[in-house]
Every structure is written in structure tokens, then in C-alpha cells.
Design a protein with these regions (language model features):
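Metal-dependent amide/peptide-bond hydrolase catalytic core
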Residues: 1-164
């Protein structure tokens, strides 16, 4: 995979593998593998397909391997990264310091979410920022009340500054 100075490198995760007959010790004629691929900037679905085909060729399996994408109705998620000196980043950091008195570090997260669509597909600079809490992505997800209040003020100040 390609590398990125902050996001490091893409990842490969085998989500599902199926082949052969249950309970028998035979080499299956067909094996289907579902691979989830996290990419870094500069990689896309075409890059991933080529990397898999290159790996098959290196193993002498190019005639036995078929690579295809899982169909979807929306674009495949592409990676993005804002520079630490991007106006959105520095404005958010300034507002955070004004509200909390603390520095807001820039961190990079090797994951995908709706921000990928905003940043890549729509060209809207995007950061992920919010309160700490627990139960992430579950029915009991919560944010600490004092952080929710602080975040609301940070959002307000950031938007006000960006709209000047």
C-alpha cells in the first residue's frame, strides 16, 4: 500500500472466507474471500484491485483469481487528510483554546465515516470534533454534559469566525 506521513499505511482486513465442504479435508475448487480495505490518500478502488492482482501474479495465481468490488449505490469511501495549518483546523483550535483554555491537538484517524463523503465527494474541508463520552455507536451512547456545552460554544465561535 501507499504510505501517508500522518495516516501511515492502508490496511487489509479479511471479513469473510468461504470455500470447500464443511467437515471434509479437501482443497476447495473455489474459495471466496471478502476483504475490507482502508486506503490512504492517493489510493482508490482501482489501486486496490491492481494490488490484489499483483499479489496473485506474484504467487503464480493470476489465472485463478478474480477480483471484483462489492456493488454499492454510493461512491467508495476515499481517504483524505487536512494539513495542520488548514484554516478550518486552526480556527477550530483557536476557538477550542478560547473556550477551554487548553490546546487542541491535531490527530489523524484511519477510518471512514460521513466526513469522507463531505471532504472527497463534495470538496468540503472536514474535521471530526465532539465531546468525549461512552457507548460509542450504541443505543446508550452519550457525551459528558459539560463537554457538550463546551463543544456547542466551540462550534459557534468556529462558524462565526469562518463566516467573517
Amino acid at each position: 500500500t501507499l504510505t501517508h506521513p500522518n495516516l501511515k499505511h492502508g490496511t487489509w482486513c479479511v471479513r469473510h472466507m468461504e470455500g470447500g465442504n464443511k467437515g471434509t479435508l479437501v482443497v476447495p475448487e473455489v474459495c471466496n474471500i471478502f476483504v475490507d480495505r482502508y486506503v490512504v490518500p492517493g489510493e482508490d478502488e482501482k489501486t486496490c484491485i491492481q494490488q490484489m492482482l499483483d499479489a496473485a501474479r506474484a504467487l503464480g495465481l493470476e489465472e485463478k483469481v478474480e477480483v471484483r468490488l462489492k456493488p454499492r449505490n454510493s461512491p467508495y469511501m476515499q481517504s483524505f487528510a487536512l494539513e495542520p495549518d488548514d484554516g478550518l483546523v486552526t480556527t477550530l483550535q483557536r476557538a477550542f483554546k478560547e473556550v477551554t483554555g487548553e490546546e487542541l491537538p491535531v490527530e489523524y484517524d484511519p477510518s471512514v465515516c460521513d466526513s469522507n463523503i463531505l471532504a472527497v465527494s463534495l470538496g468540503i474541508p472536514t474535521v471530526t470534533f465532539g465531546p468525549s463520552g461512552g457507548g460509542m455507536h450504541a443505543a446508550n451512547e452519550y457525551g459528558h454534559a459539560w463537554q457538550v456545552k463546551n463543544c456547542a460554544e466551540v462550534y459557534r465561535r468556529t462558524v462565526a469566525e469562518l463566516l467573517k
